């Protein structure tokens, strides 16, 4: 019987002046950008934490510290692919993932399918194994005031 594990991840980044955000590897036009060491992709960062947590491999900060200049402006899709390599080294593969983006703006619906496709490609799984959804906070809290964006992710991994 396969060893099955689950993990949860969460990430948040504040906004700064800018012209786009990157979520799920998709560049989305926006009046603001993420204030972050890497590209600030909270969706992928939450997913990395979920995968690493499921395998008991710590978190994204342990593997890709924001104090390391090598990760300045890093493409988070590259980080996600490295996390998948770490899982494979431990004898795990991704089963499925589910993520929620929490943002008042920009609108996510037009970009969800491209995000899913990117994530499925990076994870090495079928598209139907990746779900991404978005919600607002009804203008409550930091996300509602459009001060930043957050994301939650859960992942199931299994031994092979």
From Swiss-Prot:
NCBIfam families: ispF. It comes from Thioalkalivibrio sulfidiphilus (strain HL-EbGR7). It comes from the Bacteria. Gene3D superfamilies: 2-C-methyl-D-erythritol 2,4-cyclodiphosphate synthase. Binds 1 divalent metal cation per subunit. Its EC number is 4.6.1.12. 4-CDP-2-C-methyl-D-erythritol 2-phosphate binds at residues 11-13, 37-38, 59-61, 64-68, 103-109, 135-138, 142, 145. A divalent metal cation binds at residues 11, 13, 45. Involved in the biosynthesis of isopentenyl diphosphate (IPP) and dimethylallyl diphosphate (DMAPP), two major building blocks of isoprenoid compounds. Catalyzes the conversion of 4-diphosphocytidyl-2-C-methyl-D-erythritol 2-phosphate (CDP-ME2P) to 2-C-methyl-D-erythritol 2,4-cyclodiphosphate (ME-CPP) with a corresponding release of cytidine 5-monophosphate (CMP). It holds the Pfam family YgbB. SUPFAM superfamilies: IpsF-like. Belongs to the IspF family. Keywords: Isoprene biosynthesis, Lyase, Metal-binding. This is 2-C-methyl-D-erythritol 2,4-cyclodiphosphate synthase. The record marks 37, 136 as: Transition state stabilizer. Its cofactor is a divalent metal cation. It catalyses: 4-CDP-2-C-methyl-D-erythritol 2-phosphate = 2-C-methyl-D-erythritol 2,4-cyclic diphosphate + CMP. Pathway: Isoprenoid biosynthesis; isopentenyl diphosphate biosynthesis via DXP pathway; isopentenyl diphosphate from 1-deoxy-D-xylulose 5-phosphate: step 4/6. Homotrimer.
């Amino acid at each position: 019987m396969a060893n099955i594990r689950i993990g949860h991840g969460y990430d948040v980044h504040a906004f700064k002046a800018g012209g786009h955000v990157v979520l799920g590897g998709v560049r989305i036009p926006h009046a603001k950008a993420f204030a972050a060491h890497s590209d600030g992709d909270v969706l992928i960062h939450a997913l990395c934490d979920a995968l690493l947590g499921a395998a008991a491999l710590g978190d994204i900060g342990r593997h890709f510290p924001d104090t390391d200049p090598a990760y300045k402006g890093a493409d988070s899709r590259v980080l996600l692919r490295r996390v998948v390599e770490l899982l494979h080294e431990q004898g795990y593969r991704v089963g499925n993932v589910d993520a929620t983006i929490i943002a008042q703006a920009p609108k996510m619906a037009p970009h969800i399918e491209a995000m899913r496709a990117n994530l499925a490609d990076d994870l090495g799984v079928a598209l139907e194994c990746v779900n991404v959804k978005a919600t607002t906070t009804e203008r409550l809290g930091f996300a509602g005031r459009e001060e930043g964006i957050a994301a939650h992710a859960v992942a199931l991994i299994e031994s092979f």
